Amino acid sequence: MKIKEDKVMAVVKELFRGEQGGAVSFGDYTLNKKTKKEDIEFSGDLYKVKTFYEITKLEKNGAFVYESVPGTAVENFAVKEDGISFQVAGYRDCEITVELEESTQYVISFTGEQHGLMETNRSGKLSIGVELEEGKDVEVSIVKR
């Protein structure tokens, strides 16, 4: 799979980047082969990222945090007391799975518009479909109800 370089919005070429305030940015959906970076220290935690055009996955201290199929670029992924928020970009629509509190309801919003209420399963995972258009990012907000 070859992504057109002229249409790509910002990807995280270094695969993982810590941001001010504790947020993280990660992922490069333009890569043709699976690439990973492990044992990344940031704010007292250890991160691991795997990414390429088919999948992007983030782990924190050995635990699942984020996964998208196909791969994406994620900026300003911030975990807050009441949920998470981030910007995501990719070359086509994707399914994103995140780890949150188990059996809890969350309001899902894309670029400021509410798109419904979802409940995590007993393991705390929540999966959402995000419509992506190459060259444009989508702001995702998942807030506890």
Where are the regions that the model predicts?
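Beta-strand-rich interaction surfaces with strong enrichment in secreted/lumenal proteins
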Residues: 74-76, 83-86, 116-118, 127-131
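C-terminal beta-strand-rich structural cap/linker in extracellular carbohydrate-active enzymes
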Residues: 36-58, 66-68, 94-96, 120-145
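Catalytic cores of secreted or luminal carbohydrate-active enzymes
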Residues: 2-73
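Non-catalytic accessory regions flanking glycosidase/transglycosidase catalytic cores in CAZymes
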Residues: 80-83, 96
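Surface-exposed beta-strand/loop patches in extracellular or lumenal glycoproteins
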Residues: 87-104
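Generic structural motif
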Residues: 72-79, 108, 140-142
